[in-house]
């Protein structure tokens, strides 16, 4: 694996995106096949991928939860997580900055809670 220095952190150039995870046959967009996803995460980690990217709206909000569970058995210092604030989807431009900041903070806290399984 090739790595890059990102502000002193060693990140794999290849990341694991979670916008399109495998689904359970016949299921809906939030019905992620957790076993197959865990196998994919294990394969990625075994081959040096250490950067995982997810976001609030992926798979109806389930992407963060499933990736969090797939990574729970790995040393937390061995990988990097990115989740994103979907401001364009949950913001209202009529709100002032304080409301936007509160919404952003809430979305980030929610994402990290789903990724870690902790509230």
Regions found by a protein language model. Give the residues of each.
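Generic enzyme active-site microenvironment
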Residues: 51, 82, 119
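Glycine/proline-rich, positively charged
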Residues: 93-119
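Generic beta-strand or strand-like secondary-structure segments
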Residues: 66-70, 84, 103-110
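N-terminal binding-site loop/beta-alpha segment at the start of enzyme catalytic domains
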Residues: 1-79
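A short, structured active-site edge motif that brings together acidic residues
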Residues: 77-91
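A short acidic, helix-capping loop that chelates divalent metal ions and anchors anionic groups
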Residues: 22-27, 88-94
